[in-house]
C-alpha cells in the first residue's frame, strides 16, 4: 500500500501542507500574570473561535471566509491560515501567535527567523482541541472558561455514547476530495477520528502518524467498508464534481458492497474538515443519522454527474 506523499503532485502538496506535518508538541509557557501585556494573534478560524470562547483579547485575526466573532470584527487581518503574512505579524509585535499544529512545519521556520513567538495547538481530534483549551486556560488565567467548555464536551460525548450503546459498529471509509483527486482519512486526521469517536470502525489504519493516505481503488476495495463517506477540502464544489465523475465512470466502484447497497453519503465539508471546531457535536449527530439511524438520503453520483455535465 502506498502512503500519501507530498511529492505526488504540486497541487496536493499546496492544499495539504497542513495535513502532512508531523505532530508538534505543545510547549505552553509559564502562566501569564495579570500585569503582563498580551498581544495575541489567532491564525485560523478554528483558533479564532477558541480564543473567543475563552474571552481572550486579540490584536489581529486571520483572513477567513468564516464568521468572525463580534469582539474581533474590525481587527487587522494577517492573511489566511495556510499563508499568514510573517512580516505583518512581526510588525504587530505579538506576545503570542496561536495556530493549529498541522501548519507548524510550513510556517514555523519563517516566523522563527522573524522572532515571532508561536503557540501550536492540537486540532486533529476533539480531545486534542480540549487539551489545548485547558492549556490556554492555564496560560492566560482563563481556568473557569476552559473548565466550562471541557465539562460541556464531556457531558455531550457521554450523552452521545449512551445513545448508541449496544448498536453494531459499522466499518467506514471516509474520502476527502481535492480538485482532481481524493485521499482517505486515517484515524489521525480530524475527520477520520470522528468515525471512531462515533463508535464505528475506520477501515483505513496506518502504523505511523499519517493523517491521510493515497491508496488505489483496488486497495480500498479490499477493505470492504459498510459505509463510504465523502467530504472535501479546498475548492469543495470542484472536489464533489470530481467524486460524481469518479463514482459514475470508474467501474471498480460498482464492486464496492457499500456502493451496491447505496451506503455512500456526502458530508458537509464545513463540519468534516481538516481541523476540529466547536461543530463537532453536529458532526457526531450527522454520523449517527447516517450509520445508525439510516435517516439520511444516500449520495446519487450518477444524478450529480449528469447535472454537472448539463450545467444545471
Labelled PLM ranges:
Residues 1-11:
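Bacterial N-terminal signal peptides that target proteins for export
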Residues 18-22:
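C-terminal motif of bacterial Sec signal peptides marking the signal peptidase cleavage site
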Residues 86-94, 113-114, 214-224:
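Short helices/loops that flank or line small-molecule/ion binding pockets
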Residues 33-54, 145-201, 272, 302-312:
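Basic- and aromatic-lined ligand-binding clefts that recognize polyanionic substrates
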Residues 24-27:
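Bacterial signal peptide processing site
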Residues 39-102:
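A short, structured surface patch at a secondary-structure boundary
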Residues 68, 103-139:
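Flexible loop/hinge segments that line or gate small-molecule binding clefts
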Residues 38-39, 128-133, 138, 147, ...:
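Structured C-terminal subdomain patch of bacterial secreted/periplasmic proteins
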Amino acid at each position: 500500500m502506498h502512503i500519501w506523499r507530498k511529492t505526488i503532485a504540486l497541487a496536493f502538496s499546496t492544499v495539504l501542507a497542513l495535513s502532512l506535518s508531523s505532530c508538534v508538541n505543545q510547549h505552553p509557557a509559564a502562566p501569564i500574570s495579570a500585569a503582563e501585556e498580551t498581544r495575541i494573534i489567532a491564525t485560523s478560524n478554528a483558533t479564532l473561535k477558541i480564543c473567543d470562547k475563552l474571552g481572550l483579547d486579540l490584536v489581529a485575526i486571520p483572513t477567513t471566509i468564516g464568521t468572525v466573532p463580534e469582539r474581533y470584527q474590525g481587527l487587522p487581518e494577517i492573511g489566511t491560515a495556510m499563508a499568514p503574512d510573517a512580516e505583518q505579524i512581526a510588525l504587530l509585535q505579538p506576545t503570542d501567535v496561536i495556530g493549529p499544529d498541522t501548519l507548524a512545519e510550513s510556517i514555523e521556520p519563517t516566523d522563527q527567523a522573524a522572532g515571532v513567538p508561536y503557540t501550536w495547538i492540537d486540532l486533529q481530534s476533539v480531545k486534542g482541541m480540549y487539551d489545548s483549551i485547558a492549556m490556554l486556560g492555564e496560560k492566560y488565567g482563563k481556568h473557569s472558561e476552559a473548565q466550562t467548555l471541557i465539562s460541556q464536551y464531556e457531558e455531550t460525548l457521554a450523552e452521545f455514547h449512551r445513545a448508541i450503546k449496544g448498536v453494531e459498529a459499522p466499518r467506514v471509509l471516509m474520502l476527502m476530495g481535492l480538485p482532481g483527486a481524493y485521499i482517505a482519512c486515517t484515524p489521525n486526521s480530524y475527520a477520520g477520528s470522528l468515525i471512531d469517536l462515533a463508535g464505528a470502525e475506520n477501515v483505513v489504519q496506518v502504523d505511523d502518524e499519517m493523517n491521510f493516505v493515497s491508496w488505489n481503488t483496488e486497495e480500498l476495495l479490499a477493505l470492504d467498508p459498510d459505509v463510504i463517506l465523502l467530504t472535501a477540502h479546498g475548492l469543495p464544489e470542484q472536489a464533489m464534481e470530481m467524486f460524481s465523475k469518479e463514482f459514475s465512470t470508474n467501474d471498480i466502484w460498482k464492486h464496492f458492497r457499500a456502493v451496491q447497497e447505496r451506503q455512500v453519503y456526502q458530508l458537509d465539508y464545513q463540519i468534516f474538515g481538516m481541523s476540529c471546531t466547536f461543530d463537532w457535536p453536529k458532526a457526531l449527530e450527522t454520523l449517527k443519522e447516517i450509520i445508525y439511524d439510516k435517516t439520511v438520503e444516500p449520495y446519487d453520483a450518477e444524478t450529480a454527474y449528469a447535472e454537472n455535465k448539463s450545467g444545471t
